[in-house]
């Protein structure tokens, strides 16, 4: 049973694990995270213009980019970041960024703008199945985002053998 649950988690995480891979193209012919998704009004991007590790600057830029998101016609949709999804390798960085009242990694006495403005209200979640140790994702409040469908739910069965006492199990 644990193996089946693990497989389900791995396959679900693969959506994000392959998000930057051009070999995993979606319906528009682009990877999930791309700088040139084709839309009616031209192209749109859903990743940083320049790839960056998780830090104060990249988190703030991500939230600025999310706030500037537009629909397929180029109209602003006033999106907001809701939760950050990170691999376990970034949990300490995320904790400092999301819980410190002051700016992280600096002696300045500035406030932590992300925290004081409540820009990521649900904080962060660690996904232990993410394989890229420096990739981070931000879930937004935009409806109809990533969805998970179970086309055919897993069925299990057990059968005991009276003669040998063995139990057979299948999924």
Segments (PLM) and residue ranges:
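Long, contiguous amphipathic alpha-helices that act as assembly "spine/axial" helices in icosahedral shell
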Residues: 1-23, 84, 169
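Structured all-alpha helical bundle cores of eukaryotic regulatory proteins
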Residues: 13-41
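Sequence/fold signature of self-assembling virion shell proteins
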Residues: 30-71, 78-83, 89-171
């Amino acid at each position: 049973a644990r193996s089946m649950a693990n497989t389900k988690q791995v396959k679900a995480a693969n959506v994000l694990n392959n998000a930057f891979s051009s070999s995993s193209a979606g319906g528009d012919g682009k990877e999930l995270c791309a700088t040139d998704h084709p839309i009616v009004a031209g192209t749109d991007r859903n990743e940083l213009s320049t790839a960056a590790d998780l830090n104060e600057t990249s988190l703030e830029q991500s939230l600025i980019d999310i706030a500037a998101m537009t629909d397929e016609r180029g109209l602003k949709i006033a999106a907001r970041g809701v939760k950050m999804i990170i691999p376990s390798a970034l949990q300490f960085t995320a904790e400092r960024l999301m819980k410190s009242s002051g700016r992280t990694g600096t002696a300045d006495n500035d406030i932590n703008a992300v925290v004081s403005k409540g820009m990521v209200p649900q904080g962060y979640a660690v996904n232990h199945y993410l394989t890229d140790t420096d990739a981070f994702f931000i879930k937004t409040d935009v409806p109809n985002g990533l969805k998970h469908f179970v086309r055919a739910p897993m069925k299990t069965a057990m059968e005991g053998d009276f003669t040998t006492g063995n139990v057979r199990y299948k999924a």
